[in-house]
Curated annotation (Swiss-Prot):
Belongs to the DEAD box helicase family. CshA subfamily. Residues 215-375 form the Helicase C-terminal domain. The gene is cshA. It is an enzyme of class 3 (hydrolase). Disulfide bonds: none annotated. Residues 428-440, 469-479 have a biased composition (Basic and acidic residues). SUPFAM superfamilies: P-loop containing nucleoside triphosphate hydrolases. The lineage of its organism: Bacteria, Bacillati, Bacillota, Bacilli, Bacillales. ATP binds at A47, Q48, T49, G50, T51, G52, K53, T54. A motif (Q motif) lies at residues 3-31. This is DEAD-box ATP-dependent RNA helicase CshA.
Length: 487
């Protein structure tokens, strides 16, 4: 039985936000968790990334927020700053119409800035364990008004040595509160947390959705970041797709890609979460009607799209997680038709390739990045195919006299070559500039150096000149990363 978000009878503010985000049908984890969350039940959810668990806990969490209150009403504890940022962005979108204030807090960010933000009375805090505990110990954040706690990816926090921090944080929350705990696995220490801090929790277990992709040809191209765009345009020239979707990881990427493709002579439109629903619908209508060749999209903007006839999907940026890859390529190969999906992998993203292959239970074939000569040959072949189609239509009587006159002065090969040259779209080398995106790594590799039984996220307050080595390391990494972006 299909459950839609209308079935949850949410407030008008949340209904508006969910509609804007493109949600229609609830995923299994959402269908089971949201009613329990709204009923104020404690929940243990076993679910992988990509199953929609952020909305599963985020919707009931935001629904219970009182926007008129100046107090912190909910905290979400996440293992990494990347996840904390991602979750806070999702919660902001869900709570936008309700005016729910969301604040992400994590190590590596200036603590003075965080303290100033905390004074602006956020309703929801999303943070990493060590930095949350740091603020508790500094007394810059008080949790006596918290009524909902979410532990996201609890097993990952256990692996990173955060279990003591989590227990300390939960000890500062009122006894009467709701806890939603999400974990892919349930090792003994996580079970102990559930026993100690949860009341008669309901268990929800959902496996990550596996999708059959037998009718989709899947390829990967190993290509450096700076060569991605030329590789994309050459593929478009060679393959000449009827309808193509290009996926970018960020809104900035989508905007820049759309502009660059149009500069190179392709007709492209971009869609992402910052565009109004009306603008997104206009772009989609043009795409369905064939008025544009390429639709450039983020994962969130493309969620729930139902477009028939998509022949090619280009993953310009590798997706955030393997399940998003499955959803992306599922835009093609529909209704029994075959489709083609190509994923650009930078040399430092090979671990993501393996993770995707494990999820789809299928190896991708390697495709060599095409050369400029191959792109020109591809466009010539498109022209030849068009000429053959026109010949087969046998509607050429009006042009026969002019053709005969040409053949009196030139041989047939020269005449045909001139026609092919005239009709062929020459590759456009107009310079374009895209902001480089940092390579995406699997969580296992991102956290490889941080796994131990010790706290890794800053611990408690040790005085203003005595930051933890982890925070110093994170700050150093931030500086290096910032430098690489600006170079």
């Amino acid at each position: 039985m299909t459950i839609t978000f209308q079935d949850f009878q949410l407030s008008s503010d949340l209904t508006k936000a969910i509609k804007r985000m493109g949600f229609e049908e609830a995923t299994p984890i959402q269908a089971q968790t949201i009613p329990l969350g709204l009923a104020n039940k404690d929940v243990i959810g076993q679910a992988q990334t990509g199953t929609g668990k952020t909305a599963a806990f985020g919707i009931p969490l935001v629904e219970k927020i009182n926007p008129e209150s100046p107090n912190i009403q909910a905290i979400v504890i996440a293992p990494t700053r990347e996840l904390a940022i991602q979750v806070s962005e999702e919660l902001y979108k869900i709570g936008q119409d309700k005016r729910a204030r969301v604040l992400p807090i994590y190590g590596g960010q200036d603590i003075g800035r965080q303290i100033r933000a905390l004074k602006k009375n956020p309703h929801i805090i999303v943070g990493t364990p060590g930095r949350l505990l740091d603020h508790i110990n500094r007394r810059t954040m008080r949790l006596q008004t918290v009524n909902t706690v979410v532990l996201d990816e609890a097993d990952e926090m256990l692996n990173m040595g955060f279990i003591e921090d989590i227990e300390s944080i939960l000890s500062n929350v009122p006894a009467e509160h709701q806890t939603l705990l999400f974990s892919a696995t349930m090792p003994a220490p996580i079970k102990r947390i559930a026993e100690r801090f949860m009341t008669n929790p309901e268990h929800v277990k959902v496996k990550a959705k596996e999708m059959t992709v037998s009718n989709i040809q899947q390829f990967y191209l190993e290509v450096h970041e700076r060569k991605k765009f030329d590789t994309l345009t050459r593929l478009l020239d060679i393959q000449s797709p009827e309808l193509a979707i290009v996926f970018g990881r960020t809104k900035r990427r989508v905007d820049e890609l759309t502009e660059a493709l149009n500069l190179r002579g392709y007709t492209a439109e971009g869609i992402h979460g910052d565009l109004t629903q009306a603008k997104r619908m206009v772009a989609l209508r043009k795409f369905k009607q064939g008025a544009i060749e390429v639709l450039v999209a983020t994962d969130v903007a493309a969620r729930g799209l139902d477009i028939s006839g998509v022949t090619h999907v280009y993953n310009f940026d590798v997706p955030q997680d393997p399940e998003s890859y499955v959803h992306r390529i599922g835009r093609t190969g529909r209704a029994g038709k075959t489709g083609m999906a190509m994923t650009f992998i930078t040399p430092r993203e090979k671990d993501m390739l393996r993770a995707i292959e494990q999820t789809t239970k299928r190896k991708m074939d390697r495709m060599k990045a095409p050369t400029l000569d191959e792109a020109i040959e591809g466009q010539q072949q498109v022209t030849v195919d068009r000429i053959r189609t026109i010949i087969e239509e046998n509607n050429l009587n009006f042009y026969m006299t002019a053709a005969a006159e040409l053949l009196e002065d030139h041989d047939s090969v020269t005449v045909v070559a001139a026609a092919i040259k005239m009709m062929t779209k020459e590759p456009d080398n107009t310079p374009v500039r895209l902001t480089e995106e940092a390579p995406l790594r699997t969580k296992r590799n991102k956290n490889h150096h941080h796994r131990s039984s010790k706290r890794r996220d800053g611990g408690g307050y040790r005085g203003k000149n005595n930051r933890s080595s982890y925070d110093k390391k994170r700050s150093s990494n931030d500086r290096r990363q910032k430098k690489s972006y600006n170079s």
